[in-house]
């Protein structure tokens, strides 16, 4: 039981690594919290630092969720992997290393799915990018994909999976509550990752 609690803490700490902040400060001398939306996530990194930094941060945030979800498998623990994934997402959203001001749960949640249900991850990736290229709203694409993840979990039938996806979707939508207002008011910025924004 001790190792389980220890690894849950590790999963949270792993999720707490603010890659957007690290990449911004080390690679560009910029505190990304002071630019754009101030969010420590891939979208704000794309918009503030450019495509290269955005890809690095997004992939790193995805891998946080993937590695954390895989911890019980690596250590042969008889406990549901999604608990560790949830801990990582919690860390990403409320990171102890960045004064509990983190991202919006999207990339790290995707990483959780990549480890636990890779086929569903692939399907949802198609949903996300189809919406993104159609609407150019990252926030809307993220929220709709989160809802699609809940539907996919219901089809799957695993009760823990359903609960986990409901929690993750709820977190994603909650963290995008300001974006919802801007989408309604038509003031939400659309995606443009072709160049670094000044």
UniProtKB/Swiss-Prot annotation:
Q: Which family does it belong to?
A: Belongs to the PlsY family.
Reactions this protein catalyses: an acyl phosphate + sn-glycerol 3-phosphate = a 1-acyl-sn-glycero-3-phosphate + phosphate
What role does it play? Catalyzes the transfer of an acyl group from acyl-phosphate (acyl-PO(4)) to glycerol-3-phosphate (G3P) to form lysophosphatidic acid (LPA). This enzyme utilizes acyl-phosphate as fatty acyl donor, but not acyl-CoA or acyl-ACP.
Subunit and interaction comment: Probably interacts with PlsX.
EC class of the enzyme, as a word: transferase
EC assignment: the record states: 2.3.1.275
Query: Mostly located where?
Result: membrane
What protein name does the entry list?
Glycerol-3-phosphate acyltransferase
What does the entry give for GO biological process?
Answer: phospholipid biosynthetic process
- Short name of any one Pfam family annotated for the protein: G3P_acyltransf
GO CC list: plasma membrane
User: Per UniProt, what is the membrane topology?
Assistant: Multi-pass membrane protein
